[in-house]
Amino acid sequence: GGLSLLGGIILLSLAAHTFSIQTMIEKVSDIQNSPFFILAMVLVMIGAFTKSAQVPFYIWLPDAMEAPTPVSAYLHSATMVKAGLYLIARMTPIFAISEGWVWTITLVGLVTLFWASLNATKQQDLKGILAFSTVSQLGMIMSMLGIGAVSYHYNGTDSQVYVAGFIAAIFHLINHATFKGALFMITGGVDHSTGCLLYTSPSPRDQRG
């Protein structure tokens, strides 16, 4: 993921002759007419999907739940998993002209949302439940960014869809960081008090209600 992102940024810099994202946006026509455009777009998406744990690159995030509680809270709520989402939001003015960008981001986000939600219901470890719920929320935000980018194809960047999609995505990004960090700290309190994080109810459905 990191190497893909590095490759994408290098290709963008070759097309725009700068490493500044703001300047790249100002030179968006040069980038879109560059032979590097498609490859750069694919590499940036791969980098973003791995950083924000999208399907099929999500497995590292549930594994990270084994870390100490403060580390888990940071990984699952702060900059670590939000970096890919921020990258997609910043790069949308450059790549949204491509339908491939819009459809890929939207569909990957939706698949991640439903796949991770389903897996969360199968977990018995409290941290596992929270980890997969984090993946599903990241998928929701990713799909919001994709839906917001649809406006580039019919009414420009000032359309209500674009504004609503991106405001919703950024709001939920901040909202998710707040409640998920708190939930992981609460889970740490449960672990400290009981010495166990396994949910052992006779009826697994109790944890889903």
Task: Please identify what each model-predicted range represents.
Residues 1-205:
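...captures the hydrophobic TM-helix bundle architecture rather than a specific catalytic motif
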Residues 207-209:
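N-terminal low-complexity segments that are often proline-rich with Ser/Thr-Pro
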